[in-house]
Amino acid sequence: MEITKSAAGTLNQQDVSKYVLTNQQGTQVAVLTWGATLQEFSVVEDGKRHSLIVNKPDLAGYDHNPYYLCQALGRVAGRIAGAQFELDGQTVHLEANEEPNASHGGPHGFTFVNWDATTNQTADTASVVLTHTSTPADDRYPGNLETTITYTLTEENRLDITFDAQSDAATLFNPTIHTYFNVTDDQHDLDQQWVKLSGDKRLVLDQAKIPTGEMVPTAGTGYDFSQPRTVKDGLDQLHQTGQVEYDDAFVVEPSKDTPIATIGDTTGHREVSIYSDRNGLVVFTANPTDDARADVRDYNALAMEAQTLPDAIHHADFGDVVLPANQPVEHTISYQYTRK
């Protein structure tokens, strides 16, 4: 295992560092301290490096990136309806950065922080450990929240991402990494990328992408990924009902042993399995690297955001995102690469 550190540049008059984790197979994970960003997850196949995610080549591409490209989201990923919620008898008002709702932790959330970083290394793992304390003055959420995000690469080509947090007052905590995958050979589009999900329901969303509270079966619809299916095939079925994209929350079965989702290429070269200890997966089609193609919905990236179901604070059956005062919590997301 090897860990290197280099200067990535400067944002907001802060020096941003880049950490690269490399195992003996040549698999690399690069992390930027700005936004706790996963800049690279790549593997070596037959002597050629192949990226598994969609990325930007330099720091400038991650400065207020509208896609939150492979960046940390928090304190709460997804949207909070009305930019407010009730907690311990008090109404908490957040900044409505997506009027009239709050989105992805707000304009001063995890994405817009330059995290402190250290590293850890063992015989078969390499880690970068990112820490930050969020205050109510920063993001309007209650409590001073101490958060640690740890990226760990193993010799088995598994990337574990852990989120550890503790607050001095009750608050909300539902973080994720907004990772955009494309595991196909040339990463040009999603025509040859298939997806399989562990669940058979999705949330009904309104026009602002706020959950209505209803869960509906996916069987037989364009949202049915109970068996491996290309993104293109699913989109083609959605088009028949006037839909043009995936920007949806799926109900999945949390598990450390069974993937909540698997992504592969139809040539059979590679797969990535996603594991999570939470019950939601937001799936989003995009093209973060080509605005012209994005305008005509020519997608080359599939965001897979593992989290508790969005807007859970307003829906008791979606899961518990309340973090009581002085109580530690940990969540884990894992990506397992397999050469086929």
Swiss-Prot record:
GO terms for molecular function: aldose 1-epimerase activity; carbohydrate binding; maltose epimerase activity. Available as a commercial product from Sigma Aldrich (catalog number M0902). Pathway: Carbohydrate metabolism; hexose metabolism. It catalyses: alpha-maltose = beta-maltose. Keywords: Carbohydrate metabolism, Isomerase. The keyword Isomerase applies. The keyword Isomerase applies. The active site is at H178, E305. GO terms for biological process: galactose catabolic process via UDP-galactose, Leloir pathway; glucose metabolic process. Pfam families: Aldose_epim. GO terms for cellular component: cytoplasm. Substrate binds at R79, D247. Its EC number is 5.1.3.21. Catalyzes the interconversion of alpha and beta anomers of maltose. PANTHER family: ALDOSE-1-EPIMERASE (PTHR10091), GALACTOSE MUTAROTASE (PTHR10091:SF0). Belongs to the aldose epimerase family. This is Maltose epimerase. The lineage of its organism: Bacteria, Bacillati, Bacillota, Bacilli, Lactobacillales.
